[in-house]
């Protein structure tokens, strides 16, 4: 009796739905869901199949999909957000001039020979630079694979990275902050920021200025920034004219005061890193005393912005110190808590998004 009533209800409900039963309706939606999941898995698998030296297309902000070569893959965390998950980044070389940059995983896809031929054979209007890039991608150069250090895997570079060499192409050398004989390096393109030494020449580590001199000096605000430390001008400006942009980039000129401020932050970062993160250094009380002075000086610097603390890697060093499991004799100076306080204040009051993407 109960079965008959149940079957009757099912027939009535089926007739209201145009002859489609509930079970049939659910099954009919399954193929689309399966196809969507399959597409997502195929995209993830394609990303995982990318290897060193593969030709790829990269989507950088303000540019079309651009041919490039894959150099390296690594995982990193946001310097300011202590709760963020790991992000997958790729180091790539852009055709035809081989400027390099770090880009996010969702900005990369494989480049096939058929796609190169299709683009070059298309009658659509395209820029001369993009055509040259696709032409150069047909015969990519031989590469020597780069090696990753333990510090990079920990999302902290103890020294500036040394990029690899391309055959028949000259690369810019990058120098370590730990070396005293730093060399002046010519700047790269807007998307090639990986090293302060490449951007601004000799670091403060190679100068003879003392920490007291650096701490006592005040640097007036750069003409490129307003009273809040933000770039002047409203609206998004085109990447084609980096010289006109009110922000720090390798392509925009820096006045002496801004360079001095960058060197000052690099000096503090170098001293803090050497005192607390160097595996061969024995921490003494003088390190705590000096670190306290450095942190106080950093907190007193006006007009800091996201680019200053991330391009100098100061935020990474402070974060690493702040989360040291054990720091003997830190009760008196409370260095770890001071680092956390600085990171918290930056996360609250500085712009959340970097103005240079992919970094």
Curated annotation (Swiss-Prot):
GO cellular component: NuA3 histone acetyltransferase complex; nucleus
The keyword Nucleotidyltransferase is annotated on this UniProt entry: no
Highest taxon listed in the record's lineage: Eukaryota
Annotated phenotype, changing residue 66 to A: Reduces the association of set9 with nucleosome and the H4K20me3 levels
Segments forming domain PWWP: 52-114
Keywords: Chromatin regulator, DNA damage, Nucleus, Phosphoprotein
Stretch forming the signal peptide: none
SMART domains cross-referenced by the UniProt entry: PWWP
CDD domains membership: PWWP_ScIOC4-like (cd05840)
Ranges annotated as biased composition (Polar residues): 204-224
Keyword Mitochondrion among record annotations: no
Predominant place of localization: nucleus
Compartment(s) of residence: Nucleus
SUPFAM superfamilies: Tudor/PWWP/MBT
Oligomer status and interactors: Interacts with set9 and histone H4K20me1. Associates with nucleosomes.
Record note on domains: The C-terminal region mediates association with set9, whereas the N-terminal PWWP domain recognizes H4K20me1.
Function: Necessary for DNA damage checkpoint activation. Required for the association of set9 with chromatin and subsequent methylation of H4K20. Associates with H4K20me1 to increase the concentration of set9 on chromatin to perform H4K20me3. H4K20me3 is mainly enriched at heterochromatin and is required for proper heterochromatin assembly.
Protein name, per record: PWWP domain-containing protein 1
């Amino acid at each position: 009796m109960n079965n008959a009533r149940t079957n009757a209800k099912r027939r009535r409900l089926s007739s209201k739905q145009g002859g489609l039963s509930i079970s049939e309706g659910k099954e009919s939606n399954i193929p689309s869901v399966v196809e969507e999941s399959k597409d997502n898995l195929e995209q993830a698998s394609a990303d995982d199949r990318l290897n060193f030296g593969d030709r790829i297309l990269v989507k950088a902000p303000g540019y079309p999909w651009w041919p490039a070569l894959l150099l390296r893959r690594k995982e990193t965390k946001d310097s300011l957000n202590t709760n963020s998950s790991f992000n997958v980044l790729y180091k790539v070389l852009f055709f035809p001039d081989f400027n390099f940059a770090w880009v996010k995983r969702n900005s990369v896809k494989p480049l096939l020979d058929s796609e190169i031929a299709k683009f070059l054979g298309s009658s659509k209007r395209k820029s001369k630079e993009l055509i040259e890039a696709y032409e150069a991608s047909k015969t990519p150069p031989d590469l020597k694979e780069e090696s990753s250090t333990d510090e990079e895997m920990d999302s902290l570079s103890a020294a500036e990275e040394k990029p690899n060499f391309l055959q028949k192409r000259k690369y810019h050398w990058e120098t370590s902050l730990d070396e005293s004989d730093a060399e002046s390096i010519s700047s790269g393109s807007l998307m090639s920021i990986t090293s302060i030494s490449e951007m601004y020449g000799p670091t403060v580590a190679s100068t003879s200025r003392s920490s007291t001199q650096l701490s006592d000096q005040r640097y007036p605000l750069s003409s490129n920034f307003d009273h809040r430390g933000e770039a002047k001008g409203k609206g998004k400006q085109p990447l084609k004219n980096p010289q006109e942009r009110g922000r720090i980039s390798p392509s925009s000129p820096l006045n002496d005061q801004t360079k001095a401020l960058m060197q000052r932050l690099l000096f503090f970062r170098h001293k803090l890193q050497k005192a607390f993160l160097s595996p061969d250094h024995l921490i003494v009380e003088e390190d705590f005393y000096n670190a306290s002075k450095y942190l106080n000086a950093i907190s007193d610097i006006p007009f800091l912005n996201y680019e200053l603390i991330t391009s100098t890697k100061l935020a990474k060093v402070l974060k690493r110190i702040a989360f040291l499991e054990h720091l003997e004799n830190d009760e008196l100076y409370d260095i770890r808590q001071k680092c956390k306080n600085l990171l918290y204040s930056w996360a609250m009051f500085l712009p959340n998004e970097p103005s240079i993407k992919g970094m």
